[in-house]
A protein has these predicted regions:
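Alpha-helical protein-protein interaction modules
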Residues: 41, 78, 156, 185-197, ...
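Structural signature of tandem alpha-helical TPR/SEL1-like repeats
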Residues: 1, 23-31, 53-58, 67-77, ...
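TPR alpha-solenoid repeat register
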Residues: 12, 42, 90-91, 123-124, ...
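A conserved position within tetratricopeptide repeats
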Residues: 3-4, 30-37, 60, 82, ...
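Short coil turns that delineate tetratricopeptide repeat
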Residues: 7-8, 37-40, 85-86, 118-119, ...
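Alpha-helical adaptor scaffolds
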Residues: 65-67, 120-132, 156-164, 175-176
Length: 205
């Protein structure tokens, strides 16, 4: 354990645990994961290996921020969790696995089924990036901004969405409001200038 000190230690533990599981050493896989710093994916794996309801409940309230699963081996783990509890987190993480493998249709189907339940802005940004329907895409970008109005990337995503669809007044409204709350932020000021130019407000730009 003391030898695993890199910044991706969680992945090292998970990789080793999955290897043990693949050769039928479930107990050793569980032991490895019990020593891991852990994240949401690890939490679901621990619940899956032990078939423990209490561990599943803990996984269902874990933080999924900066968790990006990509392993095919995790697919049955998340599918099991979805069947057992139906929490949106397991569906979201499963969608990310599909997304990482360019299975966009499968990812979008999973995300659509979660509706408006998730209170996690990146969920809506991810779904918007896959959603072909303009109305639904706009709703997801707006939901992300509503959930985390301090994060500049979400305000920028909504602004760029409006600009792509030539809704320049809406784009300007979004980025102007955000720029008043985040002054002297170079990416925001740059996007504000672009929005002003798109609205032919050259003097203000």
């Amino acid at each position: 354990q003391s030898l695993i000190r890199n910044e991706m230690a969680v992945q090292n533990y998970l990789e080793l645990a999955i290897w043990y599981y693949s050769i039928g050493q479930v107990g050793r896989a569980e032991k490895v994961l019990s020593m891991s710093p852990g994240d949401a994916e690890t939490a679901y794996w621990r619940a899956y290996l032990s078939q423990d309801r209490e561990l599943l409940e803990k996984a269902d309230v874990s933080d999924v921020s900066f968790v990006f699963p990509f392993r095919e081996e995790s697919v049955p783990v998340f599918e099991w969790a979805m069947k057992e509890s139906g929490n949106w987190r397991s569906a979201y993480l499963l969608a990310l696995v599909h997304y990482s493998r360019n299975n966009d249709a499968e990812a979008l189907e999973l995300l659509r089924k979660q509706g408006r339940e998730p209170d996690f802005a990146p969920f809506y940004i991810t779904r918007a990036s896959l959603e072909p329907d303009k109305t639904l895409q706009e709703a997801d970008y707006r939901r992300a901004v509503a959930l985390d109005g301090a994060e500049w990337r979400y305000a920028h995503a909504l602004t760029r969405f409006y600009m792509r669809h030539s809704e320049n007044r809406k784009a300007l409204s979004v980025i102007e409001e955000f720029s008043r709350r985040k002054r002297n932020h170079f990416p925001t000021e740059t996007l504000l200038v672009r929005a002003l130019i798109c609205n032919e407000e050259y003097g203000a730009a």
